[in-house]
Amino acid sequence: MKKYDRGWASLETGAALLIVMLLIAWGAGIWQDYIQTKGWQTEARLVSNWTSAARSYIGKNYTTLQGSSTTTTPAVITTTMLKNTGFLSSGFTETNSEGQRLQAYVVRNAQNPELLQAMVVSSGGTPYPVKALIQMAKDITTGLGGYIQDGKTATGALRSWSVALSNYGAKSGNGHIAVLLSTDELSGAAEDTDRLYRFQVNGRPDLNKMHTAIDMGSNNLNNVGAVNAQTGNFSGNVNGVNGTFSGQVKGNSGNFDVNVTAGGDIRSNNGWLITRNSKGWLNETHGGGFYMSDGSWVRSVNNKGIYTGGQVKGGTVRADGRLYTGEYLQLERTAVAGASCSPNGLVGRDNTGAILSCQSGTWRKSNSGSTVITGRIANGQQIPLPTGFSASQCSWSVSNAENPQGWKPNYFAGSVATYDANRIVKCGFYDEYNFHKGTFRADLTGKCSYVVACQN
């Protein structure tokens, strides 16, 4: 390069650097404005969320707020109130990035006191610049966004409305936010709490809840997935495939085409368990039960036996086979021997317990007649009785005639044969003062004989 061209090159380089510096400065300003705008948009969204929560709170408590406000005296809603009632999350801060605190002032409409209107106003903290207020007023999406520039009046975005703060009993200063909630807005909020929504609204389960009875006007509820209720009253039929009940099922009557299975007892308070067509009660496990197949007999299923530790009682009891007893047969009625009876073959007893049988139309004692036994017996033995007889039916005697002992000089007495109350025999003879017991030997001591006669 020639020396006379070097000055121009330096000038060109300096100009380029100047342009670059100007572009950097301009870009930095643009970036700063962008960051500020994003921050103000975020603040506007937070104000919108707060205002939406206040709107819902007013709608749900519309009647209460009517009673606590007038056209000049407001009911004031704070952030704490919205958090405590669940309209704002517990993590929502009490102030914004500039330290301003939001409150809603609710008053009655002057022209129509039955309606409510409200204004959300920020107070305290650091004032926003006008540029920020204008930007945020346009970005607020709930209610009519605005701002306070003179400390007395709330002005809407694009200066679309202007309202004195005193109309709502509110106080604030320059550089603060204001949001107007009109009577229409709050009436809609009140209707939201009363309207049943067809679709789910996130965070608003109350919009899908009925707070009173609903009358379908005899119309149907179709394609219902599940019906959960405390009670149900039906004037017609209830049709279904299966049913599960954790409590009681009550009704005047019930008809089932197939089976009824119960996990517990089946009880009837005042009625019968009625079956038809030769059916009755059956124990499925053991195959026994009761049924009737004709008009006369209650039958045992599969000819099962009937077992009880108590009594079986009836007018007559008939056994087609043998009649067994594990103890005794007790006949309670008595008959009189010689009296008439029918039919032959009856068995009875008299008042002493003796067995009677009906023979040829007359009650007769069984095995009537007498029995006599005789024998020899030694001293000290008991007179025996015939088999099957008691002492009250018999009489007996003993004698010592087989070995008599006559009188001898100096002898006190002769032979002896007696018995006591227990039929114990004293048999022998006296030799002066000495008694000799009778034995079975054929010696001088001798032996006694007995005779026993018994009558049935």
Curated annotation (Swiss-Prot):
Stretches the record annotates as Constant region = 1-361
- Give the superkingdom in one word: Bacteria
InterPro entries (UniProt xref): Enolase-like_N, Shufflon_N
User: What Pfam families would the database entry show?
Assistant: Shufflon_N
Q: Is Hydrolase included in the keywords of this UniProt record?
A: no
Region entry Variable region: which residue ranges? 362-456
The UniProt record lists the keyword Cell membrane? no
* Keywords from the named record: Plasmid
Q: Miscellaneous notes for this chain?
A: This protein is expressed by a shufflon (= clustered inversion region that works as a biological switch). The orfs of this region share a constant N-terminus, while the C-terminus is variable.
Name under which the protein is recorded: Shufflon protein D'
Organism of this sequence = Escherichia coli
Taxonomic classification: Bacteria, Pseudomonadati, Pseudomonadota, Gammaproteobacteria, Enterobacterales
